[in-house]
Amino acid sequence: MSDGNERNQDGNNTPSQGGEQTRSSRLSLRPAGRQEVGRTVDAGSVRQSFSHGRSKVVQVEVRKPKRNAAGPGAGAAARGGRAGGRALTAAELAARQRALELQRKAAAEEAARREEEKIQIMSAAEAARRAAEEERLISEQKAAEIAALKESEQQAAREQAAAEAAARAAEQAAAEAAAREAEEAARSAPLDPRSHSTGGVQLAAPVQRLRPLAERAIMPPRPVQPSRPAAAAPARNNETLHLRSGAAAGGDDERRPAPRRSGPGAPPAPPRRPSAPSRKGGGSDRRSGRIDVRAAIEGDDDKTRSLASVRRQRDRERRQAELERLRSDQVRVVRDVIVPETITVAELANRMAARQGEVIKALMKMGVMATAAQSIDGDTAELVVEEFGHRIKRVSESDVEIGIEGVEDNADDLKPRAPVVTVMGHVDHGKTSLLDALRTTDVAASEAGGITQHIGAYQITAPSGKKITFIDTPGHEAFTSMRARGASVTDIVVLVVAADDGVMPQTIEAIKHAKAANAPIIVAINKIDKPGANPNRVRQELLNHEIVVEEMGGDTQDVEVSALKRIGLDKLEECILLQSEMLDLKANPDRVAEGVVIESRLDRGRGPVAALLVQKGTLRRGDIVVAGAEWGRVRAVLDDRGRQVKEAGPSMPVEVLGLTGVPGAGEPFVVVENDARAREISEFRQRKIKEKEAASQVAARGTLDQMLARIQAGVQKEVALLIKADVQGSAEAISTTVQKLAHEEVAVRVLNASVGQITESDIQLAKASDAIIVAFNVRATTQARELAQREGVDIRYYSIIYQVADDVEQLVKGKVAPKHREKFLGYAEVRQVFNITKTGKVAGCYVTEGLVKRGCGVRLLRDNVVIHEGELSQLKRFKDDVKEVARGYECGLSFAGYNDLREGDMVECYEMEVIPA
């Protein structure tokens, strides 16, 4: 066989009687456990051939289908048992049932396989149908494109035919003009017509067309003969210039278009096909069978190209020319290149449409070595742009803030607004109590220690119906920045002075802030109900600070009030409203909101909360606000009593929720048009803040390094603090206060001052820096508290600011090294020197002044010059050790490690005492 398998002869000669016996016998159990239902088996062997001459003999079986026995007896015999009539045993019955079960399973598997093949065939048919449908759609699309292309070519052919008709009309007009000129020439100089014969000279087609006109103009009229035109036609045909082999059969068709021939005898003109315009003028005449001398001389016999091909060629040439023009050094495209303060070399090359290598080469010529990823400053980039011949446009990063404040308001749009009044004065002079009396609230009771430590804004309605906005500022000396912020946003300053206390340091500071803000002052002399109150003393003390009240001939209003007894409150409101009318306060409510951040904090449940004072426009819920370096969409607007409002007009203090972070107190806020603008401005301001911090760190690095070196050397110590407060203003005030407590030997370093709860990251920072956490009106989270206990970090909670200052001062004093001072004890004169074997030299001395103590410091003076300074090792009187020897007594002295003693030397005794810091 060709496949390498050979049938053994023994397998071919297998007797068939075994098969007949199998067909006649019934189902039986084989020893191997394999069941066969009446099939004959032909056994044999096959030799398989492999590569490299190898072969192998394997045994094979050929199964043949069983032949069904005819008649009912066969089935009965199969059901009833063997031929002998013996009943089936249980094992045979079980084997038969298993065989039947296997057959059913095989049939079910075969049916499932056929069903799966059917599904696969149907899926393949569906895929083929879809592919055919897609091919049909593609072919239809291509046919539509071909039809559109043919239509465009036909349109071009029609346009070409129209152009040819126009050219023929122009040619005919030129011929008529030439005929008129020839007629005029003939009239002026008549000649013999026979002398004008061509004489065998072949003329061009335009000349032949003009010849009949010239002959009629020159020769006299003759009687018309019927046979002359037919005879003249061959003559004219013989005189025509033939340049192509098929031109003789054309006759006048070469000179005149075919449609002019008409009549029953004229042969039908062949249908004209639209021809594409040729690259030269004679292409269409060559197609129609006519030609002029110019085309014949040029000899343009090339095949005509299609319009699409010509258009593509022209586009390629135009693009190539433009590319060559751009690449050439002589022609450059001048661009407007926008250059910021800093730009990378790659970005600069991209904006100039130049190669990065060329830009780097230009920088190298300028002495600047830079890679494509490095940044260069704007001045260097400007030189590069000018070197490349472009126009530069310098921009700054701060340009993102251009136009953020809007335009100036029109005077017609301004409307009266409520005055903003800031209450200032010394601590415990009753500022908050006065505001509580005006608002009929009790804010002072909620403040820790009875002093104001937050800046608050409130709005009240006077009995006249007009509104007044009050800003309460702290009076403690630590809150200087808060008072400055309050004075900067105010219209009127109410200076509260206690009648029993007079002008105090913070009162003077408040006067300076008010004058710096150029705000009018109204003096409120409070606590007039207390015994010992003297308002006139207050007025006189104010004269020392250039505050002259009206009672003393000045222009500053003063009101005597009592917040506790509610005396003079209505008069104070009248003075405020009168002053606001004099100032003529107005604002435009119909514009985007602008204002200032009064205070800010981080609330655990609500997130960043900012107290805003609207100065212009109207702030609404949903506006996008940029406050300092933070931005966000306003989610809620709350008034001073915690009620939600939809909008806030000018001079209205509100709290807003929805900012991404805690803005700085005193920062301006403004409403912008979209999120992208707000995010851009916020990122720019945050970047500026980081750059400023980095610059300050670099500037202070030398001092800081020196301080750390002194700390490591033990010369200087430090107190590291991490401040966490409830509001931004308190954090600033505490940071400023503790830094003023630094000692020349102990430095106070504030690692961070922020708002919000104490978190695990704060504990880790304090642990790494060995710092103490100062918590002002905030608490630590559960996880942070557990971590602090494990790490041993000290967290100190405060609610009053002067307690913070006192504790930090004690910490600083505890780290200050105690000072030592020398205390003089007395003098002793050396009168005799004894040499003791074990002890060395011992000086016998007489105490001339003071006393001598054992273990004190001594100086040995010889001729009033100190020759030794050390300690006294032994002090004896006779042979007994004593603690001290007074004046007028003799004693024996020995010095530790020194024996150069002489008679007449003086011993000065002293001791060091510790002075607490």
UniProtKB/Swiss-Prot annotation:
Chain intervals for the UniProt region annotation (G4): 526-529
Region (G1): 425-432
Residue span of region Disordered: 1-84, 150-318
Subcellular localization(s) per the UniProt record: Cytoplasm
InterPro entries: EF-G-like_DII, EFTu-like_2, IF2_assoc_dom_bac, IF2_II, IF2_N, P-loop_NTPase, Small_GTP-bd, T_Tr_GTP-bd_dom
Start and end residues of each stretch annotated as G3: 472-475
Primary location recorded for the protein, binned into one broad class: cytoplasm
Domain of life: Bacteria
Region: G5, residue numbers: 562-564
Protein name according to UniProt: Translation initiation factor IF-2
Species the sequence originates in: Gluconobacter oxydans (strain 621H) (Gluconobacter suboxydans)
Organism phylogeny: Bacteria, Pseudomonadati, Pseudomonadota, Alphaproteobacteria, Acetobacterales
